[in-house]
């Protein structure tokens, strides 16, 4: 008997953004571990996936649930993990479970799908590599620590609360002024999806009633180097 846990990616807004494999896995699972069973039930109802045992699995009970999950696996039950939106473990519960599974020779599989940070980076138009820092902190000194010493060759992606958005943009402006470009997008894949791109001041001037889920990308502007002609001093006419 092979013990196995499957991570299933779910839509981040538009319920149509779910794969056929994800739906098949949800239908075939005996136990569905959910960040919030109420949110997950809406998705299952939409696709008429009925009579499933949903178990609340979140950051406050991750360790406590391991013995119960192990018991289910020993019974030969099929288990999958979903978060409220997107890929499990990415700024969501699940890393403890996955590490535990690896340490106990339990197979882990994943059904890929919609992801806010990848979608935001694709829409930004920024080139090069990127770094994902999870959620930006709410305290000023921690925010400064998170966004200090940026490399202009790297895009820095964070999730951010709408309640701290203006406050954070002002901190970024005070730190970098016009020397940084920002791509800010809210409600990815939803009806009210909207994005902004520009300097902190430009975005602050255009931002209205920040509500919803935001992803922010910071891109430090590269300083253009002026190449000097080493023969210039010899070419001047005297």
From Swiss-Prot:
Catalytic activity field: cytidine(1402) in 16S rRNA + S-adenosyl-L-methionine = 2'-O-methylcytidine(1402) in 16S rRNA + S-adenosyl-L-homocysteine + H(+)
EC annotation from Swiss-Prot or TrEMBL: 2.1.1.198
Subcellular location: Cytoplasm
Residues in coiled coil: none
Keywords: Cytoplasm, Methyltransferase, rRNA processing, S-adenosyl-L-methionine, Transferase
Top class in the EC scheme: transferase
Keyword presence, ATP-binding: no
Cited Pfam families: TP_methylase (PF00590)
GO cellular component labels: cytoplasm
Chief place where the protein resides: cytoplasm
UniProt keyword Lipoprotein present: no
Molecular function terms, GO-annotated: rRNA (cytosine-2'-O-)-methyltransferase activity
PANTHER family cross-referenced by the UniProt entry: RIBOSOMAL RNA SMALL SUBUNIT METHYLTRANSFERASE I
Family: Belongs to the methyltransferase superfamily. RsmI family.
Job description of the protein: Catalyzes the 2'-O-methylation of the ribose of cytidine 1402 (C1402) in 16S rRNA.
Protein's recorded name: Ribosomal RNA small subunit methyltransferase I
Gene name in the database record: rsmI
């Amino acid at each position: 008997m092979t013990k196995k846990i499957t991570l299933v990616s779910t839509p981040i807004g538009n319920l149509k953004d779910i794969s056929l494999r994800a739906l098949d896995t949800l239908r075939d699972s005996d136990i569905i571990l959910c960040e919030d069973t109420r949110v997950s039930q809406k998705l299952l109802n939409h696709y008429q996936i009925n009579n499933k045992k949903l178990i609340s699995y979140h950051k406050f009970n991750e360790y406590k649930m391991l013995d119960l999950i192990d018991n289910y696996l020993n019974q030969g039950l099929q288990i999958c993990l979903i978060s409220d939106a997107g890929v499990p473990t990415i700024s969501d519960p699940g890393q403890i479970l996955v590490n535990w599974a690896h340490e106990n020779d339990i197979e882990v599989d994943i059904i890929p799908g919609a992801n806010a940070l990848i979608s935001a980076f694709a829409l930004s138009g920024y080139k090069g590599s990127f770094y994902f820092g999870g959620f930006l902190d709410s305290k000023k000194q921690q925010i400064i620590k998170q966004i200090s010493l940026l490399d202009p060759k790297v895009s820095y992606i964070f999730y951010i609360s709408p309640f701290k958005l203006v406050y954070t943009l002002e901190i970024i402006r005070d730190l970098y002024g016009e020397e940084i470009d920002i791509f800010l997008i809210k409600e990815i894949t939803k009806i009210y999806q909207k994005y902004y791109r520009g300097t902190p001041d430009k975005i602050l001037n255009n931002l209205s009633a920040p509500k919803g889920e935001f992803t922010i990308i910071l891109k430090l502007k590269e300083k253009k180097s002026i190449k000097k002609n080493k023969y210039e001093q010899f070419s001047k006419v005297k």
